[in-house]
């Protein structure tokens, strides 16, 4: 509507727009997506061709889409767009997605993958609240601009989730992928991070801080202007709070691209001052 119905005329940010009515109509109306629930298509494969949003860089929309699509019987979904890092910094507009340049979306996409994998197809859809929802294992919220997936092995989230509501988080997951602060990891940087946790070691992978020169909705003509820039050297505080790693003797190693490791220091608790990169933390 803002672009007069013309795709090329639209310019803006729909991250805070409430798509609740779109979800309701899509689910309830036969002429939209309701036909997918009919008996005629009950034995047909259902694949989402474009799993993507439009001028939306929020932390909730991808998990909301995954939940909606599973309720319609979708068995697989293909991501519509991914900007390779070499040119992602110049990319803005309707479809922008990259691990480094769009950390909130990247973390939300990780949440969405778990929602899609672990939500039964054709479950009853919550049409009364399609943009703000919480189940036992996942939640997403337009109001709080965040999303969470949590089970015994995984804890994924996008944006600060210090208040988990009624969700119960495992204190000993095998993998954490996040953007922002959470009860398990408090990280002050602006990139995503990933922790892979075993009994005796933690592999930590931190993406660089991202600095925005323009809105992600900005279209750089001929890709001449840097939309985003990276800060690779700045150190930030990171506190890790998981069972079995509360205190003791730990050693931190910096891992190189060739797989070699360089000892940084020994510590007694997982309160770090750390720059982007890949690290190994071991119990001594």
Give residue spans per PLM region.
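Glycoside hydrolase catalytic-domain groove-lining segments
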Residues: 1-55
């Amino acid at each position: 509507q803002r672009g007069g119905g013309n795709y090329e005329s639209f310019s803006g940010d729909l991250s805070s727009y409430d798509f609740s009515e779109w979800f309701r109509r899509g689910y309830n109306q036969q002429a939209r997506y309701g036909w997918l629930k009919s008996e005629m298509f009950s034995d047909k494969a259902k694949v989402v061709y474009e799993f993507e949003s439009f001028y939306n860089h929020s932390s909730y929309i991808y998990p909301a889409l995954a939940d909606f699509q599973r309720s319609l019987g979708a068995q697989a979904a293909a991501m519509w767009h991914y900007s390779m890092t070499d040119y992602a910094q110049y990319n803005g507009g309707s479809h922008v997605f990259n691990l480094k340049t769009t950390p909130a979306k990247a973390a939300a996409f990780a949440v969405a993958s778990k929602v899609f994998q672990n939500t039964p197809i054709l479950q009853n859809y919550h049409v009364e609240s399609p943009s703000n929802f919480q189940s036992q294992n996942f939640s997403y919220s337009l109001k709080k601009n965040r999303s969470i997936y949590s089970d015994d092995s995984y804890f994924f989230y996008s944006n600060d989730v210090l208040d988990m509501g009624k969700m119960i988080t495992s204190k000993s997951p095998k993998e954490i992928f996040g953007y922002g602060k959470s009860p398990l990891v408090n990280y002050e940087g602006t990139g995503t991070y990933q922790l892979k946790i075993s009994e005796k070691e933690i592999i930590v992978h931190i993406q660089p801080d991202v600095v925005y020169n323009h809105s992600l909705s900005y279209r750089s003509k001929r890709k001449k202007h840097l939309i985003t820039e990276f800060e690779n050297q700045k150190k930030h505080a990171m506190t890790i709070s998981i069972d079995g790693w509360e205190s003791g003797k730990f050693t931190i190693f910096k891992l190189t691209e060739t797989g070699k490791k360089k000892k940084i220091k020994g510590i007694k608790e997982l309160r770090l001052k750390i720059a982007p990169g890949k690290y190994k933390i071991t119990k001594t």
